[in-house]
Amino acid sequence: MKANEYRNLTTAEIEQNVTSLKEELFNLRFQLATGQLETTSRIKQVRKDIARAKTVLRQRELGIG
């Protein structure tokens, strides 16, 4: 999801999205460790999505953007 899409969501929706992304990242790491993960690039995508969401949340806290 792009940063502009996160800006259109409510704070609660973004926080819920971050929680689900963290769970997905946790599962992806386990799949990687057990050799079941085929698309390792998904880990990077999920990490970037978490960062985007947290950035938007922080901008809201500071009143930026």
UniProtKB/Swiss-Prot annotation:
Residues of the signal peptide: none
CDD domains the UniProt entry points to: Ribosomal_L29_HIP (cd00427)
GO CC aspect terms: cytosolic large ribosomal subunit
Tagged with keyword Ribosomal protein: yes
Sample GO molecular function, one term: structural constituent of ribosome
InterPro entries on file: Ribosomal_protein_uL29 (IPR050063), Ribosomal_uL29 (IPR001854), Ribosomal_uL29_sf (IPR036049)
Keyword flag Isomerase: no
Keywords for the protein's UniProt record, in alphabetical order: Ribonucleoprotein, Ribosomal protein
GO process annotations (BP): translation
Protein family (similarity comment): Belongs to the universal ribosomal protein uL29 family.
Protein name: Large ribosomal subunit protein uL29
Gene assigned in the entry: rpmC
